[in-house]
Amino acid sequence: MTAAAPPAAAPAPADTIPGDGTYLVGTDIQPGTYKTAGPDNSAGDCYWQRSKDSSGSFDSIIANDNLAGQGVVTIRSSDGAFKSQGCQAWVKAG
C-alpha cells in the first residue's frame, strides 16, 4: 500500500489585482491599500467597487468610484469582494 501525498496547500491570496474582474477578499486578494495608475484606456474610466459579497446586488456595495486618473482604495478584511473594471493593475501599497 502506498501512502497518499498530502494535499497541496492553496495558493496565498495575491497582493496585486491584475485588472478586470471580481476578486474575493482573503481568497483571491489580500486586504490592504492598493494603488492604480488609472484607466487601461479600453473603457475611458476605471471603475472599482468594494462589496459585502460577490452577489453583484446593489445592496452589497460598500463603496465605489469611477476614476479618470490615478486612484487609491483600501480593501478591508471585512469586505467580501472587490471589483475592478477598465483599470490598470492595482498594486498593494500597504
Residue ranges, per PLM feature:
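Extracellular beta-strand-rich, repetitive "passenger/adhesive" scaffolds
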Residues: 12, 16-22, 53-54
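A glycine-anchored, Pro-Gly-centered beta-turn/N-cap motif
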Residues: 19-21, 30-33, 78
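N-terminal low-complexity, Pro/Thr-rich disordered segments
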Residues: 1-17
